[in-house]
């Protein structure tokens, strides 16, 4: 099973130095709203537009890593901000000193990540041909993100080949991050079926 998200990180990873349940109170000892204002000031016009409606919080799910990359973060919604305290409310329970990075929802990044995930899946399959697959794609993808229907299923067929492919659109997809399974949003999750080897 594999998952593809659709976010591109902005800024640098930071530590959540103060949290209260789902409230992000400080990032590297700075108010998160201050950090976001700085990121906004440094952003391109395109990213400034995305930050107004497509900003998320990425939560690193493996502690103690020295570097984090695409697929290492659990992506969660920003559900509010308090201008007075500078805190941000996140749709997740937060942990002290958890690594956090802000990502933006972006169609190009999503398509690129999907190609990379499918490429890794193709390599993992080796010479064995799957019997079929399931695709569970978020309702926030498809035509609304890419401007066309069937993007993810077409990418799957292009990379893995013609095989029975079923599934449906979801509002929450199950897939791995950092070796643990989570319910995601805005992702496509694939499950591939093939015979068990007799060896």
Which residues does each PLM region occupy?
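Small-residue-enriched flexible segments
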Residues: 1-133, 138-146, 150-163, 168-199
């Amino acid at each position: 099973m594999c998952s593809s998200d659709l976010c591109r990180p902005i800024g640098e990873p930071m530590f959540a130095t103060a949290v209260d349940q789902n409230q992000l109170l400080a990032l590297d000892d700075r108010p998160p709203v201050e950090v976001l204002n700085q990121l906004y000031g440094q952003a391109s016009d395109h990213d400034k537009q995305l930050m107004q409606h497509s900003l998320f919080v990425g939560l690193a799910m493996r502690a103690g890593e020295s570097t984090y990359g695409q697929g290492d973060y659990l992506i969660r919604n920003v559900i509010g901000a308090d201008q007075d305290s500078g805190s941000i409310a996140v749709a997740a329970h937060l942990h002290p000193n958890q690594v956090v990075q802000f990502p933006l929802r972006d169609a190009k990044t999503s398509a690129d990540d999907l190609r990379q995930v499918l490429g890794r899946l193709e390599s993992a399959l080796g010479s064995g041909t799957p019997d079929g697959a399931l695709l569970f794609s978020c309702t926030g993808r498809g035509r609304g993100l890419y401007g066309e229907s069937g993007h993810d299923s077409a990418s799957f067929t292009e990379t893995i080949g013609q095989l029975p492919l079923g599934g449906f659109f979801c509002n929450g997809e199950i897939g791995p991050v950092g070796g643990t399974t989570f319910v995601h949003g805005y992702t496509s999750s694939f499950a591939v079926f093939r015979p068990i080897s007799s060896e």
